[in-house]
C-alpha cells in the first residue's frame, strides 16, 4: 500500500524514542512512559508518553493496551481504547489500570505501555427523525443474541435489569 499517511509529531521528552512499530506492517506504534510509577492492585494512574501529534481531520488515534502486558501482569487501559481526536494537540497520556488482584506493577521510564493505532473515520451528520426503521433485532441489546449460558434468562438465579 503506497498511500501512507504522514502525521506531524512533536517530542515533548527528547530522551524518549519516537513511537515505532515492533514489526513492519503492525497496525500500532508503541508508546513509552515518561516516568517511573508503581500501580497498586486495583488502582489506576495517568501516565505521560512525551509526545504530541497533529492528526488530520478524518482520522482518529486509538490508544490500546499492549496484549502481552495485559496477559502477563493485568496491566490495561481504563478507557480502552482511548480516543485521540484530530483537533487535540496536547501530550498523549494513558490512563493505566492494574487489574491484578494482588501484585503491584512497576512501570519504568521508557517502558512501552500502550499502542497507538491511527484510523480513518467517517464524520457523519446526524438527522433527527420521529421513528427508526424496523429490523429483526429491534431493541435487543446487551445479551440479546445469547451464545453463553449466563445469558440464558430462564436459568436459575438469572437477573435481567431494566434497559438491558
From Swiss-Prot:
Gene Ontology BP annotations: dUMP biosynthetic process; dUTP catabolic process
UniProt family annotation: Belongs to the dUTPase family.
Catalytic activity: dUTP + H2O = dUMP + diphosphate + H(+)
First-level EC class: hydrolase
Protein name, entry field: Deoxyuridine 5'-triphosphate nucleotidohydrolase
Function: This enzyme is involved in nucleotide metabolism: it produces dUMP, the immediate precursor of thymidine nucleotides and it decreases the intracellular concentration of dUTP so that uracil cannot be incorporated into DNA.
Disulfide pairings: none
Gene that encodes it: dut
InterPro entries assigned: dUTPase, dUTPase-like, dUTPase-like_sf, dUTPase_trimeric
Entry's EC annotation: 3.6.1.23
